[in-house]
């Protein structure tokens, strides 16, 4: 893998031509739109035609189908997805011509430095749901955020939005230490467990990665961590600045839930911060674990000055993200849900949630996915 010696930030200016290899990808399409909005000339390539490709072309972005060194034209830099390796003809062509090649995460890391607030939400589980919750809250507060989510959010009809506000919200993945390319002003750690063991050596290695991620936060920023999770506690131990904690019931935490009640599997509770009522929340997605996700999103909103009313309104309107216990309909009277859970801990939370909803029988069809 080639490591450019020129900081990608030097290219983020009007008139620079950027080629995005794999431009139709879930986080490459919004990247293209953000770069276009910054005044860059954006072009790219993808393997197939798609609605995303059509959407990019409608904005004046030249998208080639198929990968070829000829697609590079006279570009100044190349940005690629993780799925595109050095053997790809565009990457090989760029290297041969001395055109710097950057990873997608490097580009997002450079972009977030243009925002006053960079809210990066990490964790072994719950990232997509919590990032979606935070998006609803900041939208309710009319903060007009730029958002990058690893799934589809019905409110956006996509997994991203490009806003004009001073906040960017990103789902931040630890795989291959990707999130260490970021520059968070607020880093959220939901939980830390064994995952991606094709890359990490063991749990300690994973905890070290999350610690390094939290350590990226400047002194003026905030690290928000789950006080109920052992791995998260280990990850933030020894940080040079204070940690803002959230908990389901520990009243010594900065943020905790009070008066929790369940209705058809969905929780209703008060969000308490420093012993004071910040917001009341009525969730419309089931599961005890989603209380913690909501507390994490509320904590991030609080430290960034969002009023509690926006938390209440935003979560009132949140009905889940795509493939996160997503109700698809019914079959012969049985409710059918789709969920991306593929880690043992995620499966446990999923089945516990389903059983809490009063169904007489729960059947799970599971397709193994990813190394873990």
Residues covered by each model-derived region:
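Cofactor-binding loop segments of dinucleotide-utilizing enzymes, especially the Rossmann-like FAD-
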Residues: 23, 47, 124, 150, ...
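Structural beta-sheet core signal
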Residues: 20, 44, 147, 187, ...
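Beta-strand->loop->alpha-helix junctions that form or flank phosphate-binding loops
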Residues: 45-46, 64-67, 103-109, 148-149, ...
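Nucleotide phosphate-binding/pyrophosphate-handling subdomain across enzymes
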Residues: 3-19, 27, 31-38, 263-265, ...
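Hydrophobic beta-strand scaffold residues
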Residues: 42, 63, 98-101, 145, ...
């Amino acid at each position: 893998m080639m490591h450019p010696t020129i900081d990608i930030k030097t290219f983020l200016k009007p008139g620079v031509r950027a080629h995005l290899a794999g431009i139709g990808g879930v986080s490459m399409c919004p990247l293209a739109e953000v770069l276009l909005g910054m005044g860059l000339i954006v072009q790219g390539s993808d393997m197939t035609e798609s609605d995303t490709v059509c959407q990019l072309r409608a904005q004046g972005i030249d998208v080639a189908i198929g990968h070829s060194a000829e697609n590079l034209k006279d570009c100044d830099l190349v940005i690629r997805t993780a799925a595109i390796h050095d053997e790809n003809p565009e990457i090989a062509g760029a290297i041969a011509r001395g055109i710097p090649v950057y990873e997608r995460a490097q580009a997002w890391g450079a972009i977030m430095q243009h925002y006053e607030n960079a809210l990066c939400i990490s964790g072994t589980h719950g990232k997509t749901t919590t990032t979606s919750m935070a998006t609803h809250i900041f939208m309710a507060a009319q903060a007009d955020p730029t958002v990058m989510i690893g799934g589809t959010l019905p409110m956006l009809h996509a997994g991203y939005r490009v806003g004009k506000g001073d906040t960017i919200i990103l789902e931040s993945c630890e795989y291959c230490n990707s999130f260490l390319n970021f520059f968070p002003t607020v880093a959220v750690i939901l939980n830390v467990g064994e995952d991606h063991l094709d890359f990490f050596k063991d749990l300690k290695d994973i905890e070290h990665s999350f610690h390094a991620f939290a350590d990226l936060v400047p002194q003026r920023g905030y690290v928000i961590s789950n006080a109920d999770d052992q791995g998260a506690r280990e990850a933030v131990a020894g940080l040079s600045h204070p940690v803002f904690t959230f908990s389901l019931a520990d009243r010594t935490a900065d943020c905790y839930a009070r008066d929790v009640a369940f209705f058809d599997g969905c929780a209703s509770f008060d969000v308490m911060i420093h012993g004071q009522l910040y917001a009341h929340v009525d969730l419309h997605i089931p599961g005890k674990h989603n209380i913690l996700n909501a507390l994490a999103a509320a904590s991030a909103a609080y430290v960034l000055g969002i009023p509690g009313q926006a938390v209440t309104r935003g979560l009132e309107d949140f009905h889940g993200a795509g493939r996160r216990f997503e109700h698809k309909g019914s079959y012969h009277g049985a409710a059918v849900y789709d969920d991306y859970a593929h880690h043992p801990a995620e499966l446990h939370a999923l089945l516990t949630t389903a059983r809490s909803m009063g169904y007489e029988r729960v059947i799970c069809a599971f397709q193994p996915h990813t190394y873990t």
